[in-house]
């Protein structure tokens, strides 16, 4: 019997949500995703000590630039062991500034290209704020493909699709966390609000012919992953990937094109902001996610500054 990981790979592109090179090499995902929190964790790994030193040197006393150099250096190493793409994130503190997000994204792509890595192997991660989505729209038109993250609401998914972004990362586990805490009960399988969110977005995209890739993210357990088998892509932590690799039970496809999706609806800025405001979970989780990524960005900058 093949493992659930191998079965999942038959109908979903598996992505590793980590900066751990050893785990990536062992689990053989197609793509990999990073974020400020994962980069901070990677900075403590012995294998990245030299990259930290190089980032400090090339950062020229600018902690933000040093962080970008480190992020790109980690991305370079990961790209040596995966066939697909690396997702590298823009500083979360720029989440409400379209122009600054564009400049930072262009800097990241420039650093990759200076290292001899084509932009076709990189996705720029941006928070799914109105300003972030507008930046992504411009980047896509200029040939830079994007991954819109911290996506918790249907309105965010609608706006991303209309902007023509390459890929979205709707979060499962953080939605689950909010409802579990708010309602004081557990959720399993298709009853999980996080699973329901991704399923609804997937069906909407397929029913309306959107090319944007749906990549479920932020998983708390195997049940959530299994309930989304068939999603375009799933980005999964090494711990859960290992559990899938060790489980030889049967895994069936749950999502497939052809389901009943809602009619297309285009949101202007006012409608987007109102819909997000009406969704207490998404409003709270988006704000929290930006704060957490910003905090870890600051910690990474402090770590690099201390080594200068």
Curated annotation (Swiss-Prot):
It is an enzyme of class 2 (transferase). It catalyses: D-sedoheptulose 7-phosphate + D-glyceraldehyde 3-phosphate = D-erythrose 4-phosphate + beta-D-fructose 6-phosphate. It is found in: Cytoplasm. Keywords: Cytoplasm, Pentose shunt, Schiff base, Transferase. GO terms for molecular function: transaldolase activity. GO terms for biological process: carbohydrate metabolic process; pentose-phosphate shunt. NCBIfam families: PRK12346.1, talAB. The active site is at 125 (schiff-base intermediate with substrate). Gene3D superfamilies: Aldolase class I. Its EC number is 2.2.1.2. Transaldolase is important for the balance of metabolites in the pentose-phosphate pathway. It comes from the Bacteria. Pathway: Carbohydrate degradation; pentose phosphate pathway; D-glyceraldehyde 3-phosphate and beta-D-fructose 6-phosphate from D-ribose 5-phosphate and D-xylulose 5-phosphate (non-oxidative stage): step 2/3. Belongs to the transaldolase family. Type 1 subfamily. The keyword Transferase applies. Pfam families: TAL_FSA. The keyword Cytoplasm applies. InterPro entries: Aldolase_TIM, TAL/FSA, Transaldolase_1, Transaldolase_AS. Homodimer. This is Transaldolase. GO terms for cellular component: cytosol.
């Amino acid at each position: 019997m093949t493992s659930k990981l191998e079965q999942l790979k038959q109908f979903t592109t598996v992505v590793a949500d980590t900066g751990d090179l050893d785990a990536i090499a062992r689990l053989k995902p197609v793509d990999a995703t990073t974020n400020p929190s994962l980069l901070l964790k990677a900075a403590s790994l012995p294998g990245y000590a030299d990259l930290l030193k190089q980032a400090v040197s090339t950062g020229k006393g600018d902690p933000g630039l040093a962080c970008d150099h480190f992020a790109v250096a980690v991305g370079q190493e990961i790209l040596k062991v995966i066939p697909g793409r690396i997702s590298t994130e823009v500083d979360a503190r720029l989440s409400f500034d379209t122009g600054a997000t564009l400049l930072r994204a262009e800097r990241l792509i420039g650093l990759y290209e200076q290292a001899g890595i084509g932009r076709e192997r990189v996705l720029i991660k941006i928070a799914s704020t109105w300003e972030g989505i507008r930046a992504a729209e411009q980047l896509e038109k200029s040939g830079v493909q994007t991954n819109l993250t911290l996506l918790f609401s249907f309105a965010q998914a609608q706006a991303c699709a209309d902007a023509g972004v390459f890929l979205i990362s709707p979060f499962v586990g953080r939605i689950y966390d909010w409802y579990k805490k708010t309602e004081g009960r557990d959720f399993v399988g298709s009853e999980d609000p996080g699973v329901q969110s991704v399923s609804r977005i997937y069906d909407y995209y397929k029913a309306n012919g959107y090319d944007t890739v749906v990549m479920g993210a932020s998983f708390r357990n195997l049940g959530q992953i299994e309930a989304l088998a068939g999603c375009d892509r799933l980005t999964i932590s090494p711990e859960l990937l290992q559990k899938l690799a060790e489980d030889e039970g049967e895994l069936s496809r749950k999502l497939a094109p052809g389901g009943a999706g809602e009619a297309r609806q285009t949101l202007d800025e006012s409608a987007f902001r109102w819909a997000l405001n009406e969704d207490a979970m998404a409003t709270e989780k988006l704000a929290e996610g930006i704060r957490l990524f910003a905090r870890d960005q600051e910690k990474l900058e402090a770590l690099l500054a201390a080594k200068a």
